[in-house]
């Protein structure tokens, strides 16, 4: 059974949630805030199970719940009647009807078989203002047994009145070492590890997703080929590479991140940095070649240009032209 002990990192949040469970002083509303992949859902279910577990604290160990009482078994099978996960009608937003029918009108009904009733609202930042106002009424006067957990990717999108009535727990970015250790334990070859860790920026879920993604591997392969071969490219080659880089909107930023990390490594090597501390340790030959080919000034200008490209792409300029200019400059 997944419990607190299965969650990597987030020690502070877990400590405060455990404290709420074992002191029997849970708040009526929580906001778990952090980007997708940070483990908000896992944490919410672990907390819900721990709150509803029937075993005395001494028998629960590190997971927060015993794993074998009636409540834990129901929770494990996803059929606990007192753990309610909101499922909105539409995918893109949570409307007032969703909140009314699944939360507001439901809270008055006493827990089915526990001392508490837990509501989990994923993607709470997608609530419409009307939905938030409907929820607010419940948050203002909740029945004693309710605990509402809002999972949010950006708490600033929530009404201040909601924020003021909930305990907000921001998910913390994990250290690169923690993510790297986890990936190694999962059996990911070290070769791709460094790039995945750098791209994940402290988000374990994202790291796992990237490490399993064939698309990401292909993307890395393509951009690697461009960056190492750019000096021999013809104009036609550059056009083709730019078109390819611009093709998938959601991958453009990843490509720029790769280039940025790559040229930082080149700069680091050129400045006499230790090879063991490179991000792309396995590419040291190519990096050394680049360090020999480019001047300090040129590398700095390329790095600057990559940053400019990133802000240009955010303002929706022609992506193909942006990549073309960048690749020309690298050539
Ligand atoms: Zn239990």
Please place each PLM-identified region on the residue numbering:
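Conserved catalytic/switch belt of AAA+ P-loop NTPases
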Residues: 133-150
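Charged, glycine-rich active-site and insertion segments that engage polyanionic ligands
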Residues: 1-50, 57, 74, 144-147, ...
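"Short basic amphipathic alpha-helical interaction patches in structured regions
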Residues: 99-100, 136, 163
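Clamp-loader machinery-focused feature within the broader ASCE/P-loop NTPase space
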Residues: 2-130, 291
């Amino acid at each position: 059974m997944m419990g607190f002990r299965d969650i990597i990192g987030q020690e502070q949040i877990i400590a405060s949630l455990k404290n709420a469970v074992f002191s029997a002083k849970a708040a009526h509303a929580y906001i778990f805030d952090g980007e997708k992949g940070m483990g908000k859902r896992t944490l919410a279910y672990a907390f819900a199970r721990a709150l509803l577990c029937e075993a005395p604290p001494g028998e629960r160990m590190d997971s927060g719940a015993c794993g074998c009482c009636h409540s834990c078994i129901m929770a494990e099978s996803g059929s606990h009647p007192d753990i309610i996960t909101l499922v909105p009608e539409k995918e893109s937003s949570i409307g007032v009807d969703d909140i009314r029918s699944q939360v507001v009108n439901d809270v008055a009904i006493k827990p089915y078989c526990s001392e508490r009733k837990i509501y989990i609202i994923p993607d709470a930042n997608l609530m419409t203002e009307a939905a938030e106002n409907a929820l607010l009424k419940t948050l203002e006067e909740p029945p004693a047994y309710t605990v509402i957990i809002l999972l949010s990717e950006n708490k600033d999108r929530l009404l201040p009145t909601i924020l003021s009535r909930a305990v907000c727990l921001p998910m913390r970015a994990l250290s690169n070492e923690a993510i790297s250790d986890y990936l190694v334990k999962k059996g990911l070859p070290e070769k791709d590890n460094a790039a995945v860790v750098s791209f994940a920026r402290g988000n374990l879920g994202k790291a796992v997703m990237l490490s399993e993604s064939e698309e990401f591997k292909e993307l890395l392969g393509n951009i690697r080929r461009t960056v190492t071969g750019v000096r021999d490219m013809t104009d036609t080659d550059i056009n083709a590479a730019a078109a390819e880089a611009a093709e998938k909107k959601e991958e453009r930023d990843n490509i720029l991140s790769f280039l940025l990390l790559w040229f930082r490594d080149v700069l680091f090597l050129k400045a006499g940095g230790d090879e063991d501390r490179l991000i792309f340790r396995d590419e040291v030959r190519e990096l050394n070649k680049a360090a020999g080919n480019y001047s300090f000034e040129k590398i700095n200008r390329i790095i600057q240009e990559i940053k400019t490209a990133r802000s240009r792409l955010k303002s929706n300029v022609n992506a193909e032209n942006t990549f073309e200019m960048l690749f020309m400059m690298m050539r």
